[in-house]
């Protein structure tokens, strides 16, 4: 048996595996931030009862022990994500970088920064450890670390083939696949080729998430938006941009050379995917949860 697509730290030593490791992913992102000159790193948006977040938190604490010139601190929440954001805000002057466990938390934090007048990346660098569509289309776009599931699949086959050839039932082989840092605007990189993401399956092994992560209203809204974006093509993204710009449906049809029925079909699909029932509800979702400016419909 070769276990895959589960955090290596969760897999019993009796099993062979080819998969990702949250500990290694955390260390990779910390390496990237330290190389950029970051010295005071806050890990924000950690659920107190999330085993995944505990792994990230412990990985940072242990890794930064090797770098006496760098400091790290963690900000948790018990019921609502803004508990963590507010705790960080009270101590914000002590940090130059914020690292979030995933793109949902990071986009929510960018929205929080806008409300508090914090300009990213001028005042603060922000990055996250899971890449999602919402992180590419917010503004500033999010520097993130993507798991290469194609590489995991390839290595799983290689491990299986090796075990078949080895023929020893007691032999075990474990491979942890590194992620890939995608630098974007939130750490000072201009949007360009780096905006492309490796294929991601959403929330990875979400069954390990504890606490209120999946019930927090703001994070739920962002997950609905993520599902919407995963179903969008380039034309849909341009429609979203024009909707946010306040264009009337007739003007959208004219600009995009769409017939009324085609536009109606696409708009309904967008609203349904975002779990909204009307244009007003969709706009409200965007205004209340996403960044004020976006990259929807822009050339990458």
Predicted regions and their residues:
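Bacterial carbohydrate/catabolite-sensing allosteric modules
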Residues: 1-237, 241-250, 254-260, 264-272, ...
């Amino acid at each position: 048996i070769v276990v895959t697509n589960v955090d290596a730290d969760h897999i019993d030593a009796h099993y062979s595996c080819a998969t990702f490791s949250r500990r290694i992913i955390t260390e990779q992102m910390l390496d990237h931030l330290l190389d950029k000159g970051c010295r005071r790193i806050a890990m924000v948006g950690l659920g107190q009862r999330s085993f995944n977040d505990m792994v990230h938190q412990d990985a940072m604490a242990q890794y930064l022990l090797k770098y006496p010139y760098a400091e790290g601190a963690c900000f948790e929440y018990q019921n609502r994500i803004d508990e963590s954001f507010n705790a960080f805000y009270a101590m914000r002057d002590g940090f130059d970088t914020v690292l979030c466990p995933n793109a949902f938390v990071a986009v929510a934090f960018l929205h929080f920064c806008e409300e508090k007048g914090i300009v990213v990346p001028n005042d603060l660098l922000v990055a996250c450890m899971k890449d999602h569509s919402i992180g590419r289309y917010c503004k500033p776009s999010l520097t993130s670390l993507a798991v290469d599931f194609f590489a995991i699949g390839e290595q799983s086959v290689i491990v299986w083939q090796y075990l078949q050839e080895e023929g020893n039932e007691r032999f075990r082989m474990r491979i942890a696949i590194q992620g890939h840092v995608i630098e974007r605007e939130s750490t000072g990189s201009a949007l360009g080729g780096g905006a492309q993401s490796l294929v991601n399956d959403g929330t990875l092994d979400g069954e390990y998430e504890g606490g209120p992560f999946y019930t927090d209203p703001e994070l739920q809204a962002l997950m609905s938006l993520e599902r919407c974006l995963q179903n969008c093509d380039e034309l849909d993204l341009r429609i979203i941009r024009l909707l946010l710009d306040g264009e009337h449906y007739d003007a959208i049809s004219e600009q995009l050379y769409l017939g009324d029925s085609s536009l109606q079909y696409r708009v309904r699909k967008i609203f349904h995917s975002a779990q909204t029932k009307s244009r007003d509800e969709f706009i409200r979702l965007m205004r209340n949860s996403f960044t004020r400016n976006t990259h929807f419909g822009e050339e990458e």
